[in-house]
């Protein structure tokens, strides 16, 4: 794992493939987080307790822009079963999955217990409210607050 200055790694953090993780300066990954995919985390970021970043087995990447945060319990998925085809399990190699990178631009924030599915490009300045669900390929506008299930724009954000 490569990391910059002032990096703080909490207790009981699991990083399954540290060789696929890069972290900038002034970053904190809090207790009880689990990272099992490729990650590029910018500077001045925080990942709060209980956050889970998973899927893709190194083929896909989670990228977090500088000055961004993930609140407690956020789940970022780079791969997921589509739950509409024959088998609903992750243990069988022939299962059709939804897969893709997830990118958060600079100055973004994701609220507590939100779920972000594969294949999302979240632009600069977007915030996502607590308990929100972001389906694959959702189209965001920069500097906007989103929330809900289904997710929807709430209002513009100050720069």
Where are these regions (language model features)?
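Beta-rich strand-turn-strand
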Residues: 113-126, 132-136
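Short, highly charged low-complexity linear segments
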Residues: 7, 71, 108, 129-136
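Flexible, glycine/small-residue-enriched loop-and-beta-strand segment within the central core
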Residues: 11-23, 28-121, 144, 149-150, ...
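Membrane-proximal basic amphipathic "stem/tether" segments
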Residues: 1-10, 159
């Amino acid at each position: 794992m490569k990391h910059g200055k002032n990096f703080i790694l909490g207790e009981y953090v699991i990083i399954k493939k540290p060789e696929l993780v890069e972290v900038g300066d002034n970053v904190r990954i809090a207790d009880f987080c689990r990272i099992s995919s490729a990650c590029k985390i910018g500077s001045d970021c925080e990942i709060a307790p209980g956050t889970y970043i998973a899927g893709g087995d190194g083929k896909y990447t989670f990228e977090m822009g500088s000055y961004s945060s993930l609140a407690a319990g956020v789940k970022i998925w780079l791969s997921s079963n589509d739950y509409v085809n024959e088998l609903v399990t992750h243990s069988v190699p022939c299962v059709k999955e939804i897969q893709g990178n997830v990118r958060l631009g600079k100055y973004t924030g994701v609220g507590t217990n939100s779920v972000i599915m594969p294949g999302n490009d979240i632009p600069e300045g977007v915030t996502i409210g607590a308990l929100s669900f972001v389906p694959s390929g959702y189209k965001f506008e920069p500097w906007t607050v989103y929330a809900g299930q289904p997710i929807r724009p709430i209002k513009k954000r100050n720069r």
